[in-house]
Amino acid sequence: MSESQSEFPGGGTTGDIVRTMQEAQERAAVLAQALPFLRRYAGDTIVVKYGGHAMVDDSLSNAFGHDIALLKLVGVNPVIVHGGGPQISAMLTRLQIPSTFVDGLRVTDAAMVDVIEMVLAGKVNKQVAGLINQAGALAVGISGKDGGLITARRLQRTTRDASGQERALDLGFVGEPTHIDPRVLYALSGSGLIPVVAPVGIGEAGETYNINADTAAGAIAGAVHATRLLMLTDVPGVLDETGALIPELTAEEARRGIASGMISGGMIPKVETCLEAVRSGARAAVILDGRVPHACLLELFTEAGPGTLIRGE
């Protein structure tokens, strides 16, 4: 046996020991590079909208749970707002309740909103909190109704009929936030816990509203003056006309991108959510690819984040 392959009492070879040391040195270098970022975000609140492929892929969801636990461990205060569209659709199909969508929003009657609340607040919410708990942190699942977190009203939308006349759309119990009371989030975060929020709100008369998770996350990020709103999506971020990722936009540049058509389709409401978040108090918002493992850590703790950052004025 050559010297490079000689065995040590523990059973490893010289090559094994060298590789182990190299890997350890690489990990140490990564930690050292992250130190300035750890200092930058210590004590800050980061709101994460969790959904899309990152939520249904086991490997990505487990990595997400560990990443959020790590954020809390290093002094960041994460607040998670999750979606659950596929899980809602599956339950409605199982119950033989048909779904109708208008502009990507599920028309929600009184019976359906009960099912949606059951799935979001009762099932998905606890699954997401469980991922974080399994990673060693302490997460608590709540809905927007708890502690009066999200007060909502019926979402107002209009459309034009075949004759060109504008008419109001009745989306049922689809809501939009009118007020965010973050005290329950502060109480949980201040006690060392990680809030995990199901996007369900309560109306002035006590009625329940189904709220788009992006919209809920943006409203919460603004209300808590989050340092970052991280929007996990199934796309790399905002792309230019050539298909290249745009790493950063000012709010004005983002608005011009929408007006010019560079930002189009399903990216428009995501960018508008980011704009509303930074307008109402968040320092910056990031649309990033949740299909990339450890996307949140890469965005916060490296120079080259994997998404598009939108800053306020």
Swiss-Prot record:
Gene Ontology annotations for the cellular component aspect, listed alphabetically: cytoplasm
Pathway(s) this gene product operates in, as recorded in its UniProt entry:
Amino-acid biosynthesis; L-arginine biosynthesis; N(2)-acetyl-L-ornithine from L-glutamate: step 2/4
HAMAP family listed in its UniProt record:
ArgB
What is the catalytic activity of this protein? N-acetyl-L-glutamate + ATP = N-acetyl-L-glutamyl 5-phosphate + ADP
Q: Does the keyword Kinase apply?
A: yes
One Pfam assignment: AA_kinase
Judging by the UniProt lineage, the source's domain of life is: Bacteria
The name this protein goes by in its record:
Acetylglutamate kinase
PANTHER family (UniProt xref): N-ACETYLGLUTAMATE SYNTHASE, N-ACETYLGLUTAMATE SYNTHASE, MITOCHONDRIAL
Write out the GO MF terms: acetylglutamate kinase activity; ATP binding
The residues that hold substrate are 84-85, 106, 210
What gene does this protein come from? argB
UniProt entry keywords in alphabetical sequence: Amino-acid biosynthesis, Arginine biosynthesis, ATP-binding, Cytoplasm, Kinase, Nucleotide-binding, Transferase
The places in or outside the cell where this protein is found are:
Cytoplasm
Q: Where is this site: Transition state stabilizer?
A: 49, 270
In terms of one coarse class, where is the protein primarily found?
A: cytoplasm
InterPro entries registered for this protein in UniProt: AceGlu_kinase-like_sf (IPR036393), AcgluKinase_fam (IPR004662), ArgB (IPR037528), Asp/Glu/Uridylate_kinase (IPR001048), Glu/AcGlu_kinase (IPR001057), NAGK-C (IPR041727)
Q: Which EC numbers characterise this protein's activity in its record?
A: 2.7.2.8
GO BP: arginine biosynthetic process via ornithine; L-arginine biosynthetic process
Q: What class of enzyme is it?
A: transferase
Q: Which family does it belong to?
A: Belongs to the acetylglutamate kinase family. ArgB subfamily.
Outline what the protein does.
Answer: Catalyzes the ATP-dependent phosphorylation of N-acetyl-L-glutamate.
- Native species of this protein? Gluconacetobacter diazotrophicus (strain ATCC 49037 / DSM 5601 / CCUG 37298 / CIP 103539 / LMG 7603 / PAl5)
